[in-house]
Structure formats: structure tokens, C-alpha cells
Amino acid sequence: VPLVPDATGYIAPGSNTVGIHGSWFTYSDCTDLMGKNCAMVTSPTGTGFANVGGKMCTSGTTSTATGAWGAGIGLELNDGPPQQPYDTETYKVTGFCFQLSGATIPSTTIRVAFTTQENNDNAPFEAITTPGTHTVLFSDTAQGSWVTTPTVFDPTKVMLVQFQIPSSTAAPIPWDFCIDGMTAVTE
């Protein structure tokens, strides 16, 4: 099921048959690090998420600072208002498919994560490293090896789909990539 945003990155209610509506957005560790020694998101800038035909592009560089965790882009799945959990089981959504392209795919990984109402920081994810078409199913994701108390993924309380560029203390990680042709995969 195609998920096509408008020119500001918003997917309108009723624009698809699986009830997904919300905005694309950027995020980074700058909030946690109070704007110092944090990831620099160079695009998009300002409010909204400017795009052409639903091609969501971002660029920047991560930080090597202690406490830095990276940056990324994401999509709200049920933006209310207020934002609510999205029940993937109601709409029989099992994951998402998308095209990854760009001049600089991070040399480490992009984590495609599904945050839930109870689990934002240690959300299950699948790591991807190559351009092309990718299908990431909920059943293929797992929490990171650093998670000491794993939680069970609750498909009835998904809040976001995130494309995170994790930072490294060894060297800054540059990125310049686009997500295009996003679709919800259904049973």
C-alpha cells in the first residue's frame, strides 16, 4: 500500500487504505547533548520535510562525542492529534518496503527501527547497508546486542518508523541518502 506524503512530508488521513497518517521528521542526539558536539543534520532544514514526489532525503554527519547516538529521519504512523499508537494488526501491516538511494549511504549501517509506545530507546530494528529496494518485516527485527533487558515487540502500539544513522566514537559518519517509494506491506 503506497504511503505518499505531500510537499511538506505529511501523509494525510484517508490517503491510504491502512490508516497511516503523520509527518516525516528529522531527529538527532542534539537534544540529549544540549546542542554541543552532536550530529549535524544539514538537510532538510526548517519546519516540514520538503520533498519531491515523496522522495525523503537527508544529509549530515554524526558526532564522536561521548553520549552521542546519531541522527535520522522518521515517519509518524498515527499522528492524531494527539499522536497515538498505530495498531498494525488491525490493518494487517507486517512491515514496510522502500527504495534506498543516495550519494553517501552510511559506511556503518542504517537502522530501520519500529518504536512502540513503551519502547523508544531500544526499539527493534534491522540494519541495512546497501542501496536498493528493501523490505523490512517486523518479524525480521531484533533489539540491539547492548540491550540488557529485552522487551517483546507489541505490534498494536507502533509509534514510528525510523531510519537511524548510529554514531561511532572512532570517526564521524557522514550520510546523504533518500527514502523513496515507501509502502506498507500487508498480509
Where does each model-flagged region fall?
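Beta-rich carbohydrate-recognition modules and glycan-binding surfaces
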Residues: 1-187
